[in-house]
Amino acid sequence: MQLKDSKTLKNLYAAFAGETQAWGKYSFFEAKAKKDGYQQIAAIFQETAKNEGAHAKLWYEYIVGEIGTTEQNLKDSAQTENYEWTNMYRQFAEQAREEGFEEIAHKFEMVASIEKAHEQRYNALCENIQEGKVFARDGGAVWVCRNCGYIHEGETPPEICPVCAHKKAHFEIQAQNY
């Protein structure tokens, strides 16, 4: 029997959904425990969330096979975000409005606009990979090491950070929002 024709595949989808929901829920509970002053309990929620994430990844890989390249994952993510803002949240908002839940309908619409921005961001990042612009900018840029904060000006970041020895992959273009 092929996995695609089996009840086991349905069980894998259910297990993946359950584990990802638990991962999210325990992450929320961790934040609340921290806020309430229970650091040890927060750490246990964090550890359990990490475990649930590992379980989710296990089931996900059975469902989809190997996780794709970063470029493939960006394309997949952009498609997911497009569906969410063009279809899913619009339908959810309509349904909520029909049932008299105006506030929830409005929240669905606001989240849809965020999902649209996510799609645009994923598409731009994919384009950066395709055009070789992730670690190169014509005319130069200010690059910051995400590990230690070292700042480098140039068309590309250094191959190795001269301060902390992390690889080029840890550099990003400096963004100032202050």
Where in the sequence are the language-model features?
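Non-heme di-metal
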Residues: M1-Y178
